[in-house]
Amino acid sequence: MTLRRRGEKATISIQEHMAIDVCPGPIRPIKQISDYFPRFPRGLPPTAAPRASAPPDAPARSPAATAGPRSPSDGARDDDEDVDQLFGAYGASPGPSPGPSPVRPPAKPPEDEPDADGYESDDCTALGTLDFSLLYDQENNALHCTISKAKGLKPMDHNGLADPYVKLHLLPGASKANKLRTKTLRNTLNPSWNETLTYYGITDEDMIRKTLRISVCDEDKFRHNEFIGETRVPLKKLKPNHTKTFSICLEKQLPVDKAEDKSLEERGRILISLKYSSQKQGLLVGIVRCAHLAAMDANGYSDPYVKTYLKPDVDKKSKHKTAVKKKTLNPEFNEEFCYEIKHGDLAKKTLEVTVWDYDIGKSNDFIGGVVLGINAKGERLKHWFDCLKNKDKRIERWHTLTNEIPGAVLSD
């Protein structure tokens, strides 16, 4: 081996080169110098096809001479850069080392991070978030929707603020009948409503097939109200009698399937109470409320009232009628009528309940009806028999209105 003097350039013969560990530290014999050079280009996995190794007369680069000239015979430029990375950039110190430095695998590309300009991130930033909770009261057939607050809403007015309110819509269903809304809060992008809206007449079947659409809108006195964002919750995600809390990013407006909406549209529902009173010797029929009634007027509402008949009615004296509730599709009546009749005769009777829309100067419009009695089926039959079997006990049930009543005169 030729020793280097001060100021002279080190020279190593090829024989010595093939028998020396070029890494700093004690000189150790090795099998072949190529063990310390990557056999694949930077960035490719080890299974990639190896590049052609450098010719045996290519001079090796020691850590002390990483900045020295490279041999023109070494055509694998990428391999040389990898060597610089492995032996130079990783800082091999000139001190003694217990052994040869291991070959570091090529750095893995960083994992994809969420795109700050992506759809979800953009909606959360531009449209805002909404906090609310839902509770299905199975015993009372009610869905309670508590709208808590919103944060970071999109500015809609010239002053950089908005006048937000929240609108609820049960899908599928008649538009006006299934919509509820909160109060409007003025000049804020972070409104706090803490308001509970309730849908009545919700059945287990509704919880399986319906979806709650929650929209945040900006109220405008001089123009149409503007849409800010929405979210949708399939009701089948809720457990009966358990409150579920949500904090959701608002999304852009989604289309409503009008065909499906129309095919599943109902005439409405009615909550009826039945009780046979031993004291009054009669049947007490309570008209509690209606929900999701069909709109019969041009303004998208109805002016509903309810009529009841106990048939057969030879003397035609069994007709009772509630008061008219103006401009509503979810009227609350809380009226009760008494039919004097022996308990044993009820098995031969049929209770007919019909809902009407009151119109001034023309015929009233039939909205829907329901018949309870021995010839009824399903829940209507069960409700009637439960009343007969449980004297002096008030039994309330929701019933779906139909647009046809067998044997009924559908005119008022």
From Swiss-Prot:
Q: What mutagenesis or variant effect is reported for residue 319 to E?
A: Loss of calcium-independent binding to liposomes. Loss of interaction with the SNARE complex and altered fusion-promoting activity
- Tissue specificity field: Expressed in brain; highly enriched in neurons.
| Region Mediates interaction with DYNLT1, residue ranges | 1-90
Q: Name one GO molecular function term.
A: syntaxin binding
Q: Give the way it sits in the membrane.
A: Peripheral membrane protein
Q: Which top-rank group of organisms is this from?
A: Eukaryota
Which prosthetic group or cofactor does it need?
Answer: Ca(2+)
Composition-biased stretches (Low complexity): 49-73
Domain C2 intervals: 126-250, 266-399
Region entry Negatively regulates targeting to plasma membrane, spans: 1-36
Stretches for region Disordered: 38-123
User: What effect is documented for mutating residue 222 to A?
Assistant: Loss of calcium-dependent binding to liposomes and altered fusion-promoting activity
Q: Which residues bind Ca(2+) 3?
A: 297, 357, 359, 365
One of its Pfam families is: C2
Phosphoserine PTM positions: 411
Query: Subunit details for this protein?
Result: Interacts with STX4; the interaction is calcium-dependent, increased by insulin and glucose, and mediates vesicle fusion with plasma membrane in pancreatic cells and adipocytes. Interacts with STXBP3; the interaction is direct, occurs at the cell membrane and regulates glucose-stimulated insulin secretion. Interacts with cytoplasmic dynein light chain DYNLT1. Interacts with the SNARE (soluble N-ethylmaleimide-sensitive factor attached protein receptor) complex composed of SNAP25, STX1A and VAMP2; the interaction is calcium-dependent and competitive with SYT1.
Q: What is known of its domains?
A: C2 domain 1 is involved in binding calcium and phospholipids. C2 domain 2 may also play a role in the calcium-dependent targeting to membranes.
Q: How is this protein named in the record?
A: Double C2-like domain-containing protein beta
Gene encoding the protein: Doc2b
